[in-house]
Amino acid sequence: MNVLLTNDDGIRAKGLRALYAALREAGHTVYVVAPMSQQSGVGHSLTVFEPVRATVIEEPDFTGTGVYGTPTDCVKLALGRLLPHKPDLVMSGINAGANVGPDILYSGTVGAATEAAHEELPSMAVSFDSFSHNTAPDMDLMPQARHAVNLAERMNWSAVGRRRVININYPACPLDEAQDLRVCPQTSAVWKNVYIEREDPRGAPYWWLEGEIPPASIEPGSDKDLLNRGHITLTPLCFDFTDHEGLTALKCMKLQG
């Protein structure tokens, strides 16, 4: 397959490098177009009011294009200008940190995969729960990368449906210690925001965002629940934000006309 590979942690991130190596190892042609800098939390944003620039990075075991922009910029530029033809698959990741439940709205990793899905391309977002307290920061991600590539190869993409993203999350442990893969819905639980206030040397306040998803609000069998229990999770995502139940209710209110 011809695979477009991107992420939101930047072109030098070890998760992307692991997926690159695993894809090449499996015999695929890989086109890397990824942000030059950290872009976590930018969601599906894109650059509008300034030009998008890029630079080619060539290393002994790696070749890619670094984009001074968002993950969505990377996918749009790759498909619209840089790639010689449409890829067979777009993979985004491996992200440092899980993307489950409400995370998907903020995630640049999922944002890039969504952009590809909007272009009718098979699309997969891959994340590793690296922010868990018991996860070694230097953990080798090649086993997860190989597993994700194998999933992409085995996936019946025609049965997945149009404009869908396959969202994969790996638990905070070595792959051989993970529980089995579960296909599951995302949790509807939301983050409880906590901002830590500090002062700069001039006495002006600034804030760091922290917080958590309250455990009691996480539905059993959801992506967050299963990931917390050590399972690999697979959740199909679609991005029709229309509330169809609400649509029917509003039509009954006779507001039109």
UniProtKB/Swiss-Prot annotation:
It catalyses: a ribonucleoside 5'-phosphate + H2O = a ribonucleoside + phosphate. Its main location: cytoplasm. One of its GO terms (cellular component) is cytoplasm. A divalent metal cation binds at D8, D9, S40, N95. Keywords: Cytoplasm, Hydrolase, Metal-binding, Nucleotide-binding. SUPFAM superfamilies: SurE-like. Its EC number is 3.1.3.5. It is found in: Cytoplasm. Its cofactor is a divalent metal cation. One of its GO terms (molecular function) is metal ion binding. Binds 1 divalent metal cation per subunit. InterPro entries: SurE, SurE-like_Pase/nucleotidase, SurE-like_sf. It holds the Pfam family SurE. NCBIfam families: PRK00346.1-4 (NF001490), surE (TIGR00087). PANTHER family: 5'-NUCLEOTIDASE SURE, PHOSPHATASE, PUTATIVE (AFU_ORTHOLOGUE AFUA_4G01070)-RELATED. Belongs to the SurE nucleotidase family. Nucleotidase that shows phosphatase activity on nucleoside 5'-monophosphates. This is 5'-nucleotidase SurE. The gene is surE.
